[in-house]
A protein has these predicted regions:
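A structural boundary/capping signal
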Residues: 23-209
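Positively charged n-region of N-terminal signal peptides that target proteins for export
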Residues: 1-4
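Bacterial N-terminal signal peptides
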Residues: 7-18
Length: 209
């Protein structure tokens, strides 16, 4: 366990060195998480590209389970999240794909969709329930469409984002949240009702709305 923890810390140290101002905003949230989960609403049209992905990856889009899961955020589970976040961010090299194309990083390259799908697959391989691993779409502070992996835990809904190094609470990102997949099935999406205003603990500034 000690060697595993030291390895994870080494990965995190390398990852922190490569990210910019967005990462700096979120670093204060790597210890304390909010318990507030996302609030979802009506059914919405799934993101472009999902249908093509499901045609090629049927197993990924089948019904995940009967009940939504909230994973207990034990030290080992937390370490899983940090390792997967760091490893996938380092393993996949950024490349702008068409937003209509979703897929895994078969050639080692991809966009935000690729990072989110790879993290979901990696956590499933480590024994995490699919019903706790949810893809979510948002609009960034610069107005760009973005996809991330949201993990439902006892410590809150946590985000694994390719734009920053740490795992963060969803309320701490300067995004306008749009929609999220249903817990049981990747092909069903719902609106995200709560759109929190990010407050910088360092500067006391609010970003987004």
């Amino acid at each position: 366990m000690l060697s595993r923890g030291l390895a994870a810390l080494s990965f995190l140290a390398l990852a922190f060195a490569g990210f910019g101002s967005l990462d700096a905003r979120a670093q204060s949230d790597t210890v304390a998480f909010s318990a507030a989960p996302m609030t979802t609403g009506a059914l919405v049209v799934p993101p472009a590209g999902l249908l093509g992905f499901c045609v090629k990856n049927l197993a990924e889009c089948q019904r995940a389970g009967e009940m939504p899961a909230v994973v207990d955020l034990s030290p080992d589970r937390r370490l899983d999240l940090e390792e997967v976040q760091t490893l996938v961010n380092a393993r996949v090299h950024p490349r702008e794909n068409s937003r209509h194309e979703w897929g895994f990083a078969s050639d080692g390259y991809g966009d935000c969709n690729t990072y989110a799908l790879e993290k979901r697959r990696e956590l499933v391989a480590r024994g995490w329930p699919k019903t706790a691993l949810l893809l979510a779409s948002a609009v960034t502070e610069t107005g760009e469409g973005h996809l991330v992996l949201v993990v439902r835990t006892s410590g809150g809904d946590l985000v694994l984002d390719n734009r920053l190094a740490p795992v963060v609470d969803w309320t701490r990102l300067p995004y306008r949240w749009v929609s999220r997949q249903n817990e049981q099935r990747l092909t069903i999406w719902v609106s995200i009702e709560a759109r929190p205003i990010y407050t910088s603990s360092a500067a006391g500034q609010k970003v987004g709305g």
